[in-house]
Amino acid sequence: MTNLNYQQTHFVMSAPDIRHLPSDRGIEVAFAGRSNAGKSSALNTLTNQKSLARTSKTPGRTQLINLFEVVDGKRLVDLPGYGYAEVPEEMKRKWQRALGEYLEKRQSLQGLVVLMDIRHPLKDLDQQMIQWAVESNIQVLVLLTKADKLASGARKAQLNMVREAVLAFNGDVQVEAFSSLKKQGVDKLRQKLDSWFSELAPVEEIQDGE
């Protein structure tokens, strides 16, 4: 398994929906979460870049699918934040359609990172994202963000509770605590991404050799 240098990650493009994404080749790992789950902060922490993903003071601002390339053919995908109360209902439905379409149809999608505030995990739409991924045979890493907001005992209790709850999905769902501020869980995230990004390599090599 190759240890990728995530600091080399760079922005490629924004797309309003799956039809405007580049060709469905290589490997993609998508990041999804409610609008205030700390998704942009997690991407910036992962890549050790202050402004790779824009952190907005106005949750629900990111309405586009944003693509970042780690190395050639290996991409991180920042999906639109979901579930923000002040976003019009029609826009919410549009986002949810776009998210569902991406998870169901994108062949290069290898893994899904679902981010949730550790204090308010497993809201309806979080569960919907995990369910979609499991039904599409996509592995999931749940990051319980803002873990620094809880004392150690409460943090462990939440982590154990969510780990227990996700068993009901009957899929490959891993759960870790994460803090952008304290850099907690970053190594676990990198390890998971490395494993996802290396999974298709043998198949590609076989095809090249034919």
From Swiss-Prot:
It comes from the Bacteria. GTP binds at residues 33-40, 60-64, 78-81, 145-148, 178-180. Residues 25-199 form the EngB-type G domain. One of its GO terms (cellular component) is cytosol. One of its GO terms (molecular function) is GTP binding. Belongs to the TRAFAC class TrmE-Era-EngA-EngB-Septin-like GTPase superfamily. EngB GTPase family. This is Probable GTP-binding protein EngB.
